């Protein structure tokens, strides 16, 4: 790997954001997967509300790109391990990552394809009336604004991607 001043600057800036480490996104594929697994194991000690906020916050700090897959075409969606190990995320990939994190942690949720401001986005509904990935790092209650919900999936609907 060639190290540039930009790479070094990104690492130095992104190590700690809002009192949490984000350096795992600069690890190799195995390191990213191990960091994700270790973080998911910590969720088991939290109550449901805290888990929702922790998942929203953790996924807020991923490396963002414009598009990693087509949210309209389920067959383009990566499995959880491919998603995390690739290490770059579009807004829909953030939602899919939240969904995978919750499902693999045993939290009841469903994935929703929505259109927000004319853009498709994968959201996660949890605890019956809370949405994740509507706004970065936030858990939204009941006020879903102008979102159009087009389709939803339970974990069992996506068994080809993640075993429940």
Residue ranges and their predicted role:
Residues 1-164:
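A structural boundary/capping signal
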């Amino acid at each position: 790997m060639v190290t540039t001043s930009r790479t070094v600057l990104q690492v130095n800036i992104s190590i700690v954001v809002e009192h949490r480490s984000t350096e795992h996104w600069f690890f190799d594929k195995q390191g990213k997967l191990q960091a994700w697994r270790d973080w998911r194991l910590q969720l088991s000690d939290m109550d449901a509300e805290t888990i929702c906020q922790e998942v929203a916050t953790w996924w807020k700090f991923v490396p963002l790109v414009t598009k990693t897959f087509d949210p309209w075409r389920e067959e383009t969606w990566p499995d959880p391990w491919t998603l995390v190990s690739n290490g770059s995320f579009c807004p829909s990939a953030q939602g899919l990552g939240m969904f995978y994190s919750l499902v693999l942690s045993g939290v009841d949720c469903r994935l929703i394809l929505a259109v927000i401001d004319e853009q498709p986005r994968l959201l996660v509904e949890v605890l019956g009336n809370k949405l994740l990935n509507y706004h970065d790092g936030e858990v939204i209650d009941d006020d879903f604004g102008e979102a159009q919900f087009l389709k939803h999936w339970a974990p069992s609907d996506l068994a080809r991607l993640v075993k429940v």
